[in-house]
Amino acid sequence: MDALTDRQLEVLRFIARQIEDNGYPPTIREIGEALDIRSTNGVNDHLKALERKGFLTRDPVKSRALIPTPQAREVLGGGARASNVVPFTRTPAVGLKPAGRLVEIPILGRVAAGQPILAQERVEDTVQVDSFLLGTNKKVYGLRVQGDSMIGDGILPGDYIFVKKQLHAEDGDIVVAMIDEEATVKRVYFEGDRVRFQPSNPRMAPIYVRGSDFRTTMILGVVVGVYRKLG
């Protein structure tokens, strides 16, 4: 694999840092402004070089579809988890507001525990949770569950799941994933050149995504808790 120039490494680091901080990649214009690259053509030249050298994948139709490859993660210090990473793009996230020992979790629409449906990214409500249960992580948000594919894990229709935004998941984690632009809740398993999204309802079949389709699949976060209203 060809070595990176200092400038290419700088661009790659900026992309990775923006994904880590914001949950989605920067635009070409944002890269240029941050790194003082005067033209979008100049930024594109660096992106093409990173792609050609195997450090970046991107979708030319989508301005934010810039995904560091496993090789890039090794260069940037994330090689230990590289094989377990599904490409990640934008995910809803609203900062938590501490209120004594309570934090407010924003509820950002709905997600399917059944057939994938599009999650609506708007704040519908907030719930207050003791920080002892979820900590004070500012990258936690809530989604309202529809469907019954995760009833074996105690996630029922109408429940609210708490989701920690992050770039990776481990085998067996319950995740919110975007598959072909629709969101769903499933357990994730990495199986060689494919990823299996497994429901816990035995009446429902898993969803398989092969490596060639990773571009249209992304992890939006890992489920860290469930909230249920009674009465």
Swiss-Prot record:
This enzyme's EC code(s): 3.4.21.88
Record-marked site positions (Cleavage): 113-114
Keywords from the UniProt entry: Autocatalytic cleavage, DNA damage, DNA repair, DNA replication, DNA-binding, Hydrolase, Repressor, SOS response, Transcription, Transcription regulation
GO molecular function: DNA binding; serine-type endopeptidase activity
Catalysis: reaction(s): Hydrolysis of Ala-|-Gly bond in repressor LexA
SUPFAM superfamilies on file: LexA/Signal peptidase (SSF51306), Winged helix' DNA-binding domain (SSF46785)
GO BP terms in the entry: DNA repair; DNA replication; negative regulation of DNA-templated transcription; proteolysis; SOS response
InterPro entries in UniProt: LexA, LexA-like, LexA/Signal_pep-like_sf, LexA_DNA-bd_dom, LexA_repressor, Peptidase_S24_LexA, Peptidase_S24_S26A/B/C, WH-like_DNA-bd_sf
Domain of life: Bacteria
Pfam families according to UniProt: LexA_DNA_bind, Peptidase_S24
Active site: 149 (for autocatalytic cleavage activity), 186 (for autocatalytic cleavage activity)
Feature: DNA-binding region: 28-48
Stored Gene3D superfamilies: Umud Fragment, subunit A (2.10.109.10), Winged helix-like DNA-binding domain superfamily/Winged helix DNA-binding domain (1.10.10.10)
Description of how the protein assembles with itself and partners: Homodimer.
Similarity annotation: Belongs to the peptidase S24 family.
Biological function: Represses a number of genes involved in the response to DNA damage (SOS response), including recA and lexA. In the presence of single-stranded DNA, RecA interacts with LexA causing an autocatalytic cleavage which disrupts the DNA-binding part of LexA, leading to derepression of the SOS regulon and eventually DNA repair.
Protein name: LexA repressor
Origin organism lineage: Bacteria, Pseudomonadati, Myxococcota, Myxococcia, Myxococcales
